[in-house]
Each structure stands twice: as C-alpha cells, then as structure tokens.
Amino acid sequence: MEYREGLIIVSACEAGEVFEAVLRGKSDTELRRIASFYDYLEIMPLANNHFLLDNRTVRSEESLRHLNRRLVQLGQELAKPAVATCAVHFLDPDQELLRRTLLAATAFAAPGQAIPPYYRPTADLLHHTPYLGP
C-alpha cells in the first residue's frame, strides 16, 4: 500500500473484514492472510456485539466469547496485539441521545443497543472481558 508508512491500521469492529472472516469461519490460512494487513486486532465487549444474538447470527454469548478468543489467538499467531476497545462514537454517555437522533434517519440506527458506544476506561473493558484472561 503506497501510503501505509506511518499509519496504524486497526481491524475494526464487527463490520471489519477480520471479525467478519472469523464470524464466517474462514480457514486459518485465509484468516492469517486477512489479519496480517493490520497492526492490531480489536476485541469488543460482548454487549457491543449482542445484536448478533438478537438477529440470530450467533447462538449464544459463548459463541461471542469464542469469536473474541479466536481474535486473540489470531493475534498471537501473527505477533500482533489484540486490544480491548469499545468502538467509541462519542465521549460521554449523555451524548448518546444526540447520536441516536442523528442516526434515526439512517440505516445505521441501532435502537436498544446494549452498550452505547461511548468512551470506556480500561477498568470497564477489563470487567467486560475476564474470559480472555489477564
């Protein structure tokens, strides 16, 4: 990629190609090929992807845990950090209403989202991912 130098490329949330490839059960070879492009892999709290349970893409919270564990494993295989993030779309929880209002007329509206995408400190992220270990 011509302009990649100096950039940090992250794998993104469930809409990113790495998570999507893990979700779709791509082969280990294909997963490594896709993930090798990124500098680090993002892990979201389960509640961020709870909609995948609601729309029946996955069957259980354990399935969501498995997806995150696979992302961590993939990072280890490629010597890339897997980082707990929270897909921040606004800074403070009280800004959620403004964001929902702006999204209401778009295809991206997500009523009833379990965890609004505001900034969460490290302690909160660790609280939501104990199954990944220390």
Model-derived regions: residue spans:
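Phosphodiester-processing cores and adjacent nucleic acid-binding clamps
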Residues: 1-134
